[in-house]
Amino acid sequence: MTDVKKESDGPEPYSSSAFDFTLLPDYNNDFINEDDFAEFAKALAAPDHLSPSTEDLTAPQPETGKFSANNDWKPIHQRVRRRKKSKAPPRRGKDETREGFVYVLLKWPLLVVVLGWLLFLSIAYVFTRLYIYLYEHMVTWRGTRQKLRRQLQNASSYEEWIKCAQQLDTHLGSDDWKKNPSYSYYDSKTIRKVHEQLVKLRQRAESDETGKSTEKHVDGQPRAVEDLRALLEACIKNNFCGFENPRLYSETYYGTKDAVQSFIEEAEASLAFLLNSSQLDAENKRALFKHLGSNFGRTALCLSGGATFAYYHFGVAKALLDAGVLPEIITGTSGGALVAALLCTRTDEELKKVLVPALAGRITACHEDTWTWMKRWYATGARFDSVDWAKKCAWMTRGTPDCVVWSAVLASAAVPGILNPVVLMKKNRDGTLSPYSFGHKWKDGSLRTDIPLKALNLHFNVRFSIVSQVNPHINIFFFSSRGSVGRPVTHRRGRGWRGGFIGSATEQYLKLDLNKWLKVLRHLELLPRPLGQDWSEIWLQRFSGTITIWPKSIPSDFFYILTDPTPQRLARMIHVGQQSAFPKLKFIANRAKLEHLIQQGRRQYRPRGIREDIQAVLSEDDLQGLLKRTKSKSPSEEAIYPLSGSESSSSADFSRPGSPITLPLGFTFTRKNKKGLADLRTDPKALTDTPNSPSLSARLTGWWNTKSPRDSHPSTPKDPSRSLSPFTHHDRPNSMFELRPPKEVRDLQARTHGRPQHRNSDFLEEIRRRSSAFVEGEGSDDEGRAGRYRRGDVDAGAQDAEVYGEPAEFGDNEGDGEEVQSAVGLGLEGKGL
C-alpha cells in the first residue's frame, strides 16, 4: 500500500505527455444530448409554484368584473390613480422574529460595533500569524534542518518524499519516539496485549489449517480460529484504544509508533487469514465481515468548494490514486462537486490519463467576454448561463446513463450572483428527463454545509473523513499549534509550540474570539441577508475532518478566481495538491489496509456474490446440453429431474421439475438460516423403523375437510395413467438449482415413489401461494415466479446448499438472524420460508 509503481501511474504534472490533450480519453466526445438540455431549459423557465413572489402564468386568470360610473355629474376626463401592486412579502417578517421597539433601535448600532470589533480581531490575527511565520523561519528552520526541509518540499514523487521525510525524522530524533510505545493519546498497554494475542491465535490457527498442529482439540472447547475471530470482532473498531488518533501521526514526518504499526500489520494478517481460511464456512465469514464493516466504518474523500481554487483537488486525488488509497465514497461541494463528478464517473486507469494539465482544454466554463456576462448579470442577476454550464459539464460527468450528475453539480455550484438556482433532473424509465422534487430549485450547498459529515455517516457509515479544504476565506484559520498529520512541530524537537507558547496562545485566543462574535451576529440576527442568504454560515460551519489537507495557494489565485485555468497553471495546482497530500498518505494507508480487506470480505461472501460460483458446478456447455435433452424427450419418457421423477406427489396435482417429495416420518431437515448442506442430519434408524405416514399436506387437508364440508374431497390415490407430464407447463428447468439435488434427497426417491396422493383444497393452495419464497425467473405465472419453492418445497434450501454452499437468496440481503422453524409432531423440520 502506498508503494508507488512507476509503470502504472499516470504522467507527472510537468512531463511533456501531460500537456498532450489528444491523449485524454473521449476528448472529442462531448456527451451532449440536446433533448436532455431542452428539458432542462424548459424546467428552468417554468414558474416556481413554491415562491409567493413569482407569478404563475399557467394558473387560470380571474374573471374581470363589470364596472359602472358612480354618477353622471363627475368629469369624464378625471385622472384615476392606479393602485400600486403590493410588494413582495419581506424575507423575514416581524412575526417571524418577534421584533420590538428595542430591537429596531439597537440593531444597527450593535451591528456596527460588532463588525468593528471583528475587523480589529482580524487584523490582530493576521499580525499574529505573521509573527509565528517569522519566528519559525528565523529560529526553527536553520542549518541542516532547513536543508532537509527544502529537499522534502522539492520532492517530485512520493517515493522520493518518503526518503527525505525519514532523513528529517532521524535528524530530529523522532526514531527514538517511535520505539517507545508509551504515549498519552492512546492505550499502549491494551494495544500491546491485543497484538501479542493476535499473533499467538493466528499462528495456532495456521497450524490447524495446515494440519501441523501438535495440540489435540478437546470437544466443547473453542478452536483457535474461533478465538481469533472473537478477538478481531472486539478490536477491529473505529479508533480502537486510540490507534487512529491523528496525534500519533503528528509527531513525525513519516510513520507512527512501532507498537501501533505492528498492531495494524498483525490485524491485517489476521483478517487476510480468516478471509481465506477453510475452517469457517461462508455464513460465518459473511456475518464476521458484516459486523466488522459496521464497527470499523467507511472512509470518504470530501472536496470543498472554492471556485477555481477547487482545481487543487486534482492534485490531491492524483496522489491518493497513485498510492492506491483513493476512497470509494467521494463527495464534493460547489467547485469540488465538479472534481468529484469527474472522479466518480471514470475508472482508475482512465483517471491516471485524465488528471493531467491537458485537462485544462476541457474546462471552458468562463470563456465568455466581459461585456457578454455583464449584460446577463444585469438582466438575470447571474454571471453565467445555467444551460451553457450544463453542456460544459456533460463531459466531466461523462453522460452518466442512470442519473443526471451534471444537474447535481450545477445545483451545488449555484452561488447567488454567479449562477441562479437550478432544477435537479431525474431520468425516467424511457430515458427522458424530468424535474426532480416537483421542480424545486437548489443553490450552492457550501453556503450551509461545505463538508456533509453527518449525512455521510448516516447514509454510508462514514467514520473516517479525508477533507481537501481550499476555501480561500477559511484557509488562513487552519493552524495547528502542536503540529498536524505528517507536519510535526520542529521547535525543541517536537516538544514545543509553533511560534513559542505565547504565539500559539495568542492565535488560539483571537480565533476563538472571532468565532464567538460571529455567533453573536447570527443568534441575534443582526447581520443583513443580501440575496436572501444567511452569510454567517460560511464562517461558522465545520470545515475539517479526521484528516484535513489544505494546499497552499498563492496571491495570483485570487485574481483568477473566476477564470478558466491554462495548462501551465493547472500543472502547478496539480503539483501543489500532490505535495500537500504526501504527509497524510501513511495514515490513510494504515486505515485502508484494514478497510479494503473488510470490504473484500463483504463483497465476496454476500449472498448475491455467491451466484458467481455456479461455473464451478455446471459449465455453460453442461447447461445447454441438459436443456436440449429436456426438450427432446417426449411426455411419456421418464423425467430427467430426480426430484420430479416420481409420478406421485403429496402436494400437487401433477409432477413438475423441483416438486417436493413426501418425506418419511422421522426424517428431518433441521437447518439454520443460510447454512450449508453439512448441516443436514438424517436418522437412519428412523428411516428404517418408522412406518409410513401421510404427508404434511395430507394431514392438513384432512383437518380442513372436517372444518369445511363443502370443500371436502375423499383422499383417494391418483391414477398414474392420468398423471400429467412434468413438462406440461415447463419445457426447461425452473432454475439451475434443480439440476443437482442433494444426495440425501435422491436416496429417498425409492421410499416415496409409491405414496398415495391427496387433492389439496383451494384454501391450502392459497396459503402456499402466499407463503412461498419467490425467486427471479421468466414468465408471469405463479409457477415461473415461485419456481421450486412453491407447494412447501422444504428441500429447496438443501438443494441450494449443495450448489452454492448456502441458500440462494438473491439480492443484497444481509440479515444476520438465525431461524429454526420446526413442525412439531409431524415428523418434519425445515427452514421457515
Swiss-Prot record:
Q: Where is the PNPLA domain?
A: 301-457
Q: Which UniProt keywords apply?
A: Hydrolase, Lipid degradation, Lipid metabolism, Membrane, Transmembrane, Transmembrane helix
Spans annotated as Disordered: 1-20, 49-71, 630-657, 680-833
> Which regions are flagged for Acidic residues bias?
809-819
Matches recorded under Gene3D superfamilies:
Cytosolic phospholipase A2 catalytic domain
For bias kind Polar residues, which ranges apply?
Answer: 689-707
Which GO biological process entries does UniProt record here?
cellular detoxification; lipid catabolic process; triglyceride mobilization
Q: Which GO molecular function annotation, any one, does this entry have? A: triacylglycerol lipase activity
Family note: Belongs to the PLPL family.
What is this protein's record name? Patatin-like phospholipase domain-containing protein SNOG_00918
This protein's species is Phaeosphaeria nodorum (strain SN15 / ATCC MYA-4574 / FGSC 10173)
